[in-house]
Amino acid sequence: VLSPADKTNLKAAWHKLGGHGGEYGAEALERMFATFPTTKTYFPHFDLSHGSAQVQGHGEKVADALLHAVGNLDDLPGALSALSDLHAHKLRVDPVNFKLLSHCLLVTLAAHHPAEFTPAVHASLDKFLATVSTVLTSKYR
């Protein structure tokens, strides 16, 4: 459960991303593809080369979904229900991949905002991404 301090940290962290969410989302995807090559199997129709328009576009989708989640911290299951259905029933993404992408997002955010990436912010972001992952995999059961 996200505490009031976590919610404050998350909103502040997302505010600092400014217009870079899509850029960071794409960078996190590229990190994931490089570090965990098996994740590429879910994107057979994508050009997965550095800076590809398809990876950039999907990075934007990831960032938009997380921004939507941050705006609905008190109802993450409701806010992410359609996305959970999509990943569980249509795309059939292995749930472990959400954890892998979450890790790559944390690394990307820490690399770009080291001063703001305090232990408290890190813990709040980690808890948030774990909660989002849990919600996204809830329809698998």
UniProtKB/Swiss-Prot annotation:
The modification N6-acetyllysine is found at residue 16. Red blood cells. Gene3D superfamilies: Globins. O2 binds at residue 58. The modification Phosphothreonine is found at residues 8, 108, 134, 137. The modification Phosphoserine is found at residues 3, 49, 102, 124, 138. Involved in oxygen transport from the lung to the various peripheral tissues. Heterotetramer of two alpha chains and two beta chains. This is Hemoglobin subunit alpha. The lineage of its organism: Eukaryota, Metazoa, Chordata, Craniata, Vertebrata.
